[in-house]
């Protein structure tokens, strides 16, 4: 089980990204628009830089929904390899069979 503080920190980041997504998209559109004057684009760049780092989507870590584990998380199931193996051993994932050779 992951530390609760790490899981909560990631949840806080997700909320920040959701709240700031529109503003970030607006600023990025201004920065990418080559028809705008350079001063306006630079001002938008500075405003984007002043925003909290945790409001960027790249700061979100994929974590296991079951255990909170940050490594080896499958995107499709949002579960770590350990949780998948555990659920598969108990027969809770249809079609998953533990292999042996």
UniProtKB/Swiss-Prot annotation:
Keyword Lyase among record annotations: no
GO function terms (MF aspect): rRNA binding; structural constituent of ribosome
SUPFAM superfamilies, sorted: Glucocorticoid receptor-like (DNA-binding domain) (SSF57716)
Basic and acidic residues: compositionally biased ranges: 1-11
Record's keyword terms, sorted: Ribonucleoprotein, Ribosomal protein, RNA-binding, rRNA-binding
InterPro entries linked to this entry: Ribosomal_uS14 (IPR001209), Ribosomal_uS14_bac/plastid (IPR023036)
GO CC annotation terms, alphabetical: cytoplasm; small ribosomal subunit
HAMAP family: Ribosomal_uS14_1 (MF_00537)
Assembly and oligomerization: Part of the 30S ribosomal subunit. Contacts proteins S3 and S10.
UniProt-recorded name of the protein: Small ribosomal subunit protein uS14
């Amino acid at each position: 089980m992951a530390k609760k503080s790490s899981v909560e920190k990631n949840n806080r980041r997700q909320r920040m990204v959701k709240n700031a997504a529109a503003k970030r998209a607006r600023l990025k559109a201004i920065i990418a628009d080559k028809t705008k004057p350079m001063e306006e684009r630079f001002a938008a760049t500075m405003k984007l830089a002043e925003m909290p780092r945790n409001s960027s989507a790249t700061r979100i870590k994929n974590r296991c929904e079951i255990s909170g584990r940050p490594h080896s998380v499958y995107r499709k199931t949002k579960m770590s390899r350990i949780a998948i193996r555990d659920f598969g051993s108990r027969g809770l994932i249809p079609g998953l069979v533990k292999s042996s050779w």
